[in-house]
Amino acid sequence: MYAIFVDGGRQYRVEPGMELDVDYRDIAAGENLKFETVLAVGAEDGLKLGAPTLDGVSVSASVLGMSQDKKIYIQKFRRRKHSKKRTGHRQKNTRIRIEEIAGV
C-alpha cells in the first residue's frame, strides 16, 4: 500500500516504514506528525484518487531527528568594479518515518 500526500508544496509517494526528509519543523525527535492532504492511495484492489484530496485519509509519521542538505554557494560578481561576494546556505530538514496510512 502506498499514498501520495502534499507537504510544503511538494508531493511525496510513501509506504509504511519508509524514511524521508520533509521541510523543517520545530518538533522534538520521537513526536508524531499527521499529514491530512492525501491526494491518492494505492493498494492491491486499485488506486483511489481524490478530487483534489481524499476525505478521512491521513498519513501518520514519527520524527527521527533533524538534518541538513549539502551546502550551496551563491556568488555575486560586479564587472569592472573589483567587487565580488560569495555566501553559502544549508537548508534544514526534518527526518521522518512513515508509520501508517489510516482511513483507507
Curated annotation (Swiss-Prot):
GO terms for cellular component: cytoplasm; ribonucleoprotein complex; ribosome. GO terms for molecular function: rRNA binding; structural constituent of ribosome. GO terms for biological process: translation. SUPFAM superfamilies: L21p-like (SSF141091). Keywords: Ribonucleoprotein, Ribosomal protein, RNA-binding, rRNA-binding. InterPro entries: bL21-like (IPR028909), bL21-like_sf (IPR036164), Ribosomal_bL21 (IPR001787), Ribosomal_bL21_CS (IPR018258). It comes from the Bacteria. The keyword Ribonucleoprotein applies. Transmembrane segments: none annotated. The keyword Nucleotide-binding does not apply. Part of the 50S ribosomal subunit. Contacts protein L20. Belongs to the bacterial ribosomal protein bL21 family. NCBIfam families: L21. HAMAP family: Ribosomal_bL21. This protein binds to 23S rRNA in the presence of protein L20. This is Large ribosomal subunit protein bL21.
